[in-house]
Regions:
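Catalytic and substrate-binding regions of cell-wall glycan-acting enzymes that process beta-1,4-linked
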Residues: 135-179
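Acidic, aromatic-lined catalytic clefts of primarily extracellular/periplasmic carbohydrate-active enzymes
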Residues: 1-136, 166-213
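Residue-level recognition of short, well-ordered coil/turn positions
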Residues: 147, 163-164, 195, 231-232, ...
Length: 252
């Protein structure tokens, strides 16, 4: 996994679920892989994205009928169809080659908009290139999972200021009045747990001391992969929530 491994592991959910078309609920559309929602995509866009990810044309063609279907219509589509699946390698490719560029650009745009409207509370001249790997991973995950940083003003401001004590107060995500227990727990362990974060910083320093510099983003992703390899995803993942749901809100 090249980038944003925390988000990837969270989005694939229960083992095998993401490899078949499924309906996450709410206002989402038919979804496959790590959050590829076809509810607001055109047939041509779906076909191009899926084949670019290495999915065979026959499977991609079978999925283009899910275009523009959301809510109950998407749920019915999933219930009426079977025998469509992709491989683990294909869903990784879909994430890395299609979804990461798409949501990274959304994150960059939303940060610029947020900074413009909160100039008095964020660092001067802050932009995507000035952020640490930790900041990028967090903000990318919130855009990918919830759709909007604007729904989390206290958290976004705290992340941009690297005020981790305040982030620890506001990081929890809720949906329909229920906390996303597993995602919140893993988020804290990876990005906020003082002991774990300190361990990562020490490992980075050791690598530099041995003249083996590792890019911060790459090191962070490697450590997240190791964290998930020690965990049982199938028994602990939260139910996937539609990205554009109005039910997302910040813990205050």
């Amino acid at each position: 996994m090249a980038k944003y491994t925390f988000t990837y592991h969270q989005e694939i959910g229960h083992q095998g679920q993401s490899l078949v078309p499924h309906f996450p609920g709410g206002r989402s559309g038919v979804t496959i892989g790590p959050g590829y929602d076809m509810g607001h995509r055109t047939p041509q866009e779906i076909y191009t994205d899926l084949t670019n990810a290495g999915i065979d044309p026959e499977t991609a063609y079978a999925l283009i009928d899910a275009a523009d279907k959301t809510g109950p219509e998407a749920a019915s589509w999933v219930a009426e169809r079977g025998g469509i699946f992709i491989t683990e390698q294909q869903q990784r490719s879909l994430f890395e080659n299609v979804l990461v560029p798409e949501y990274e650009q959304r994150t960059i745009d939303q940060i610029a908009s947020f900074v413009s409207s909160h100039a008095d509370s964020v660092p001067e001249n802050v932009d995507w290139d000035s952020l640490s790997g930790r900041q990028k991973q967090i903000l990318f995950d919130y855009v990918y999972n919830t759709g909007s940083l604007a729904r989390f003003p206290e958290l976004t401001t705290a992340v941009l200021n690297e005020d981790w004590d305040t982030v620890s107060i506001h990081y929890e995500r809720f949906s329909d009045d229920q906390p996303l227990v597993y995602r919140n727990e893993m988020f804290y362990r990876e990005f906020l747990d003082p002991e774990y974060v300190h361990k990562k910083e020490e490992e980075a320093e050791i690598g530099n001391a041995n003249n083996q510099p590792v890019a911060e983003d790459q090191l962070l992703d490697q450590q997240i992969d190791e964290l998930y390899s020690e965990d049982e995803l199938a028994e602990n993942t939260d139910d996937v929530q539609a990205k554009d749901s109005d039910e997302w809100y910040e813990h205050i």
